[in-house]
Amino acid sequence: MRIFFITTDHLELRIWFRDDEDFRVGMNYLAVTAAVTGLKVIAFILMSNHVHILLACPNRVEALSFINHFKQLYGTYYCNRYGERRFFRRNGVDIQEIDPENEGLERVIAYIVMNSVAARICASANSYRWGSGSCYFNDYKETGRSLSSYSGRSRIALLKSKAMLPGNWTVGAGGYVLPESYVSVKGVETLFKSPLRYNFFLNNSSKAKRVKDLSGPAFRDQVISDGFKDLCITLFNKQDAFSLSVEEKAEAVRQLRWRFGADSHQISRVTSFPYSEINEMLSRLP
């Protein structure tokens, strides 16, 4: 079996997951995709503007089929909720085969689960809900309710899918299938051999090194997005960004920078204002 590392293009003007409900749906659709394709998920993480998935599968075609199935499911949901069509079809995907020799696999797993730490969303990989980081070497895993205990109608409502998943897969308190139901936890723990060695790779990953270079406060895209909506209403009495004048846009950008310490990339994602326009506005600030 070969190993493939899937990464979606990092979005600059949009975000995949606008709130916890979007993340919950994304988690369930990843479980559905794993069940439908029968492929083994080694590690994954859902970030606000991109997704990383590490798969064990026979070839690149099946890896591409996996991510396309996931994007199709989530894209349909996203369109129904937000009215944006063909958004995910245009979001590119990079697939790389990973050589398991010379600790290549360990480094990729560490890179994936440390994304949330590098983004300064959480202090440790095992405290981020929307990925597999909490699965490995964790003696306090969340317990939940087996899928077999749900009625057919309740299961479909929960998963937003009619796909049949194994009855022993578990749904946690957050309303999504827990990753340890379909992630190769034992395989990863065997690969790393011990929690000490696992933590060594986490602490020495490129993502961990990036954290050391960053300073200042950090907020999730979802928090800043909510803050931006509040600013539009309270400061300008406008319901959305599209109604703002040029001067109001500049003031909103200034407020996001001042209140949240957000950079140009993050402001562009949550407001959908062009990155170049954000940079120009910020350059005028004293």
Specify the residue positions occupied by each region the protein language model found.
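Short beta-strand->loop micro-motif that forms the acidic, two-metal-ion catalytic signature
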Residues: 50-58
